[in-house]
Structures are given as structure tokens and as C-alpha cells.
């Protein structure tokens, strides 16, 4: 569970709801018609932008914003160095006995053990990276589309409410409440866009970048093992993938 995503979502809504309660009754901020326009309208408009597979596939990818935990690059480097040492001592077949928890790393090692040359291994791993990145980009795009559409649907709902209000001006006392209800759709659209959809899209983009970086690290490590490079050289080379802070920490140790 990603604590930052969960805390951000709950905390953001908690403060907004608290402000509503302090400003008056929470009931004045609830309107079922406005919710239907923003939520229902957004779903079907976004559905028009994507295929059914891309739309519903985004719900699976969305779980990565809350549940996904990327492998730490230093842990991947340590595992690759361990495998490089084993390969130098016992050959590539010795890698079959090692426990590998990362599926992409396992795929690369399987290609080595099967005896494929470096070009085949590189091409296969690059293709895997590209296709995974494409799937994640599509999933992120769905949530960005929701973030774009929700405020627009909110504005449409507000315009609908204003038209209904202006068509019935007989009772001046009803104008204020009618205007408040009309503005609720804009509020709902802004809340969903800026507190749900765009933050999830940004977190998914971060996850995608982290996963792509890790996979490139693994690919370079697997190819270095295949090339028979010294484990120390591999370790030094792969540490270029670490950020400056972690690299400095590694040097100090």
C-alpha cells in the first residue's frame, strides 16, 4: 500500500468536507442530479475517447497508484551482481538454481540460459519495456481524460441549471438556492479533476517511470552478465542508475 497516495486522497477530502461543515450544513453541498451529470457524463464521454479494452484496463492499472511498490534499484543491482558472480563460477546454467522474484529479470535470465545471443536478448527485453510502457501510458491517458472532462461536464451542468433558473424568475427568493444548486456541478467537476483524476494520473506516470528505469537497469545487467564482465565492474556501472543521494551513500559505505 502506497501511504502517500492514500493519505493525500483521504486528507484532501477531509479538509474540504471540514470546510463545508464549518461553512454550513453538509447537505447544502449534496445534489444527486449534479452528481449524475458529472460522474455519469464523464464516464461516457471518456469511453468515447478509448476502446473498451483500454478503458476497463485502466481500472487495473489504477491499482498501481495505491498498491504497487517498485523494487529498489540498489536491491536489483545487488541481485544482478550476485548472479554475475554465480555465472562466472558455474556458467549460465548456475543461474537456473537462483531464486528471482522479479518477472522481467527472470525473463532475461531465461533468455541467457537458453543460449540466445546478445542481439536477441536485447531486442526481446527492449520490446517488453516498450509494450509495458505503452500499456501504462494508455492507462494514465484514461485518467488524464477524466481530469479534462470532469470540469467540462461540471460547467455543462451549471449551464443547464442556469437555464432552468432563468426560465423561472417568478419567485425572486428561489433564485439564490437555484443558483447554488447550479454551481454544485462545477464544484463536483473541479473536486474530481484536481483531487482524484489528475493526482492518480501523475502517480501512475511516476510508477511507469520507476518501472521503466528498473527494467532498463535489469536489461543492462543481464547483457553485462552475458558479456562475462567482472561483477565489480557491473556493480560500478549499474550504480549510475541510482540518484545522487543514494550514490553518495553507496560511496560512503
From Swiss-Prot:
It is a multi-pass membrane protein. One of its GO terms (biological process) is proton transmembrane transport. It is found in: Cell inner membrane. GO terms for cellular component: plasma membrane. Pfam families: MotA_ExbB. Its main location: membrane. The chain crosses the membrane at residues 6-26, 28-48, 146-166, 180-200. Disulfide bonds: none annotated. Residues 201-253 are cytoplasmic. The keyword Cell inner membrane applies. Keywords: Cell inner membrane, Cell membrane, Chemotaxis, Flagellar rotation, Hydrogen ion transport, Ion transport, Membrane, Transmembrane, Transmembrane helix, Transport. The keyword Ion transport applies. Belongs to the MotA family. PomA and PomB comprise the stator element of the flagellar motor complex. Required for rotation of the flagellar motor. Probable transmembrane proton channel. Each stator complex is composed of 4 PomA and 2 PomB subunits. 2 A subunits and 1 B subunit are thought to form a single ion channel, so that each stator complex contains two channels. This is Chemotaxis protein PomA. It comes from Vibrio alginolyticus.
Amino acid at each position: 500500500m502506497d501511504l502517500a497516495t492514500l493519505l493525500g486522497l483521504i486528507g484532501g477530502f477531509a479538509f474540504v468536507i471540514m470546510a463545508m461543515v464549518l461553512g454550513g450544513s453538509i447537505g447544502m453541498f449534496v445534489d444527486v442530479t449534479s452528481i449524475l451529470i458529472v460522474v455519469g457524463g464523464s464516464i461516457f464521454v471518456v469511453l468515447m475517447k478509448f476502446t473498451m479494452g483500454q478503458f476497463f484496463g485502466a481500472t487495473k492499472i489504477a491499482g498501481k497508484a495505491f498498491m504497487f511498490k517498485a523494487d529498489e534499484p540498489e536491491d536489483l543491482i545487488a541481485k544482478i551482481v550476485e548472479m554475475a558472480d554465480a555465472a562466472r563460477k558455474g556458467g549460465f546454467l548456475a543461474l537456473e538454481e537462483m531464486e528471482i522474484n522479479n518477472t522481467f529479470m527472470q525473463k532475461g535470465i531465461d533468455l541467457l540460459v537458453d543460449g540466445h545471443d546478445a542481439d536477441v536478448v536485447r531486442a526481446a527485453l527492449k520490446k517488453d519495456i516498450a509494450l509495458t510502457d505503452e500499456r501504462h501510458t494508455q492507462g494514465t491517458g484514461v485518467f488524464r481524460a477524466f481530469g479534462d472532462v470532469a470540469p467540462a461536464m461540471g460547467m455543462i451542468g451549471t449551464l443547464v441549471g442556469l437555464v432552468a433558473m432563468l426560465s423561472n424568475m417568478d419567485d425572486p427568493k428561489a433564485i439564490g438556492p437555484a443558483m447554488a444548486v447550479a454551481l454544485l456541478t462545477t464544484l463536483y467537476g473541479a473536486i474530481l479533476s484536481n483531487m482524484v483524476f489528475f493526482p492518480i494520473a501523475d502517480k501512475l506516470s511516476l510508477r511507469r517511470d520507476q518501472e521503466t528505469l528498473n527494467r532498463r537497469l535489469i536489461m543492462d545487467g543481464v547483457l553485462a552478465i552475458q558479456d562475462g564482465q567482472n561483477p565489480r565492474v557491473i556493480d560500478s556501472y549499474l550504480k549510475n542508475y541510482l540518484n545522487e543521494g543514494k550514490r553518495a551513500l553507496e560511496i560512503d559505505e
